[in-house]
Amino acid sequence: MSAGRPLLLSYVKDIHDHALERDRDYFRQSREKLLGCTLEELASARAERLDAARAGLESVRLTLKGGAPFLSGAHPGFADYMVGGFLLWVASIATAPFLTSDDPLLDWLGRVQDLYGGLGRKSPLNAIAA
């Protein structure tokens, strides 16, 4: 999944804003040093990065086109937990949706959220799609 880096870069400022107050200075300084720009500069280029992230999820969409309910087939497996968990984590901190409302990944993410008695629906999430 080549969507990981563009998604993370799109939401670094959101991660900062969700961090504990005592951790924010360290988070900001270390990420700005690592990335070579301010968190605000990263946030200003979010739209382009989200386009790249959506394109990077195409392999996930293609896998699901085979008709199986999960990436691993009839039952959820490692890929479903890793990719689904990452996308749901992003949704927990993202202040802007990262998928479009017609994205076929939304049905799959719904199935991932329903696992373990709907545990994925019990965590507060921001809008995943717009």
Language model: regions and residue ranges:
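C-terminal alpha-helical interaction module
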Residues: 1-130
